[in-house]
A protein has these predicted regions:
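Short, Lys/Arg-enriched N-terminal segments with co-localized hydrophobic residues
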Residues: 5-13
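Conserved AMP-binding/adenylate-forming core of the ANL superfamily
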Residues: 44-48, 108-162, 179-184
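N-terminal amphipathic, basic-rich helices that act as targeting or association modules
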Residues: 12-82
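Structural core segment of the AMP-binding/adenylate-forming
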Residues: 162-202
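AMP-dependent adenylate-forming
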Residues: 30-31, 35-37, 95-121
């Protein structure tokens, strides 16, 4: 297998500054992907991805753990890259992938400016997301709704963001240390249907 760094050095006509040890290369996610895809070198993978982008992106979907249905079509090509449509028939919610784990391992680690510490395991995060989901549904928040939050970057705001995305709504937030005018300017752009606010800054 030829590493990506070696390939870069060859292309630009110079020696690489650093080359990883073979064991590190073999243990990389890229090497694992190449093995599953059945290609021998990075150069082969790159060439195949250009010659057959639909093949490449199907391989990527199948190997990266996305939870959802990819659909039959992988790529609708446009005249320019920005016009291309990937997986037009896919059905998924990114939260299903982000919350694929539900065990007692660490999910979030929070340390506040005043020394407050909070660690949240995956099962606790699931429970907190569920609480927010229920509150959102009771407030008739769904696909296309807009939810805003004036909250610090604690595990709670991540749970709220995940819950909002899980019901198909749009999420935006500002920190409590925003001034009133700045918060109004941000939120007025999206005209939220529901606003969450914390009573303190962590």
């Amino acid at each position: 297998m030829v590493s990506g760094r070696q390939g870069v050095g060859i292309v630009f006509g110079m020696e690489p500054i650093w080359t990883p040890a073979p064991a590190r290369v073999e243990g990389s996610l890229l090497a694992q992907f190449m093995s599953v895809a059945g290609v021998e070198s990075y150069a082969d993978l790159h060439a195949r991805s250009i010659a057959d982008p639909a093949w490449f992106w199907r391989q990527f979907w199948d190997s990266c753990g996305v939870v959802g249905q990819a659909g039959d079509r992988v790529l609708i090509e446009g005249e320019r890259m920005r016009e291309a449509v990937f997986f037009p028939d896919a059905r998924l919610n990114v939260v299903d992938t982000l919350l694929a784990r539900n065990d007692d391992s660490l999910a979030l680690m929070f340390r506040g400016e005043a020394g407050h510490a909070l660690d949240m395991i995956w099962s606790e995060l699931h429970a907190r997301v569920s609480q927010y989901q229920q509150a959102l549904r009771e407030a008739a928040v769904g696909v296309g709704s807009r939810v805003a939050a004036m909250m610090a970057n604690t595990p709670d705001i991540y749970a709220l963001m995940l819950a909002t995305a899980s019901v198909g709504a749009v999420f935006t937030s500002v920190s409590p240390d925003f001034g009133a005018a700045a918060a109004v300017d941000r939120f007025s752009q999206v005209e939220p249907d529901l606003l969450f606010a914390s009573d303190r800054y962590c």
